[in-house]
Amino acid sequence: MASSPRAFALVFFAIAAVGCTQLTTADDAAPPVWQKAHATFYGGADASGTMGGGCGYGDLYSQGYGTRNAALSTALFNDGASCGQCYKIACDRKRAPQWCKPGVTVTITATNFCPPNWDLPSDNGGWCNPPRPHFDMAQPAWEKIGIYSAGIIPVIYQRVPCIKKGGVRFTINGHDYFNLVLVTNVATTGSIKSMDIMGSNSTDWMPMVRNWGANWHSLSYLTGQTLSFRVTNMDGQTLVFKNIVPSGWKFGQTFTSKLQFK
């Protein structure tokens, strides 16, 4: 006996509803994307050897980055654009169970650059050679996930939001006609896509250029002026830090805002 149009429609919509429900559930339950890399360690047991570095953060203790930090290989460093980004890392027990501490992850901040070593092969000492994704981690962070005697371990990693206390900070270095601004304590993406500066003698924003790492520069003469910054993070969120730097500022000073990326 042939089905009625109404019965067919009810069956169709019931199947469609089940399909939609299954699709939504699958999407919601999808695990985060983990990528493969390797990790070594440096800097000593107290991570004192990780200070400074290719991002320009200087004293990582006073800047709030502590010992959970890492130098990134060329494939991850992105010419300094990755400075400040946060990564959750776990030892890959599927590839080296004997060298992994099970059930443990550590979240680190990118604070340095791990340069290539072209004198050594990529699989035997030249760990940071392109195109290898590699983390040279501060020793205390590395030992959270790996057995010390291994020296190098396979890892899985993923980008995660950076969690920070307080507002974005700006440190002004350089000299007249060369204003070098270090941006630190950046939440969410951790890294900056673009930055503009405006002095109190002007109403125009002037684009700044990434000089190295997390340092941005302007060649304008701004000494004695109140300064404002317009900062866009890697997600495209823009914050305006109006008059964050008073007119009596000096090179070497740090100014903490009340604004933070969310």
Swiss-Prot record:
CDD domains (UniProt xref): DPBB_EXPA_N
Signal peptide: 1-20
Electron transport in keyword set: no
Domain spans labelled Expansin-like EG45: 52-167
UniProt keyword Cell wall biogenesis/degradation present: yes
Residues bearing glycans: 201
Keywords recorded for this protein, A-Z: Cell wall, Cell wall biogenesis/degradation, Glycoprotein, Membrane, Secreted, Signal
GO cellular component term, pick one: extracellular region
Superkingdom, taxonomy of origin: Eukaryota
SMART domains listed in its UniProt record: DPBB_1 (SM00837)
Cellular localisation: Secreted, Cell wall; Membrane
Domain Expansin-like CBD span(s) in chain numbering: 177-257
Protein's UniProt name: Expansin-A14
